[in-house]
């Protein structure tokens, strides 16, 4: 059984981040280890009026040291919601706790609907870009893709050419495979654009009439599990989208 380490916060309430990743990746038949760099009382999405935040940055190096001491290593890493102070420790863990050929899956969970999540400074996308560089799989939504590439996000109306231009810019960060979510050229359909740097494959599902927080984490978790079970990026993205639709 392959072993994956997911590095993202624990939100005690809100059906997101680590509390979503652990059961879904485990259900895929992959051992899921966790490293939460922060503990939040709840999700920061609209609908919650505030939250507590316990920063665990100081613990990350201690955990890493014990893993190195014991020879604990991982076949893959999957990062989600993290803060600026977490990025350097995560990059270090990528180097010291990786098995040969370890896969890096990065979900740059920081923005949606044209704006950064509450709590992130305006310059955070440039910090997140450091974590995204050289990722094997990058899973941004359209807003995150725009911010990572220094563009002004649009709320809607992306053309196929604009989508593929965004993808090209993301590959420019050294990303091997881009899985762009929230793609739509028809108001009734919503889907993904998956690129290996040579071709772009699109997959769409009927658009749900309501928005649900945590769906991006469900998508990324199932995607990560499917990749570790040998699925291609396009196959993993299609499966993850189907699971999200079924869950909603």
Regions found by a protein language model. Name each.
Residues 7-10, 37, 80-82, 107-109, ...:
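Fold-independent oxyanion-binding glycine-rich loops
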Residues 1-106, 110-118:
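Conserved N-terminal subdomain of the carbohydrate kinase-like
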Residues 16-20, 55-62, 72, 85, ...:
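Conserved active-site and cofactor/substrate-binding residues in soluble primary-metabolism enzymes
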Residues 118-201:
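Conserved phosphate/ATP/ADP-binding segment of small-molecule kinases
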Residues 164, 169-248:
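Conserved phosphate-binding/catalytic region of the ribokinase-like
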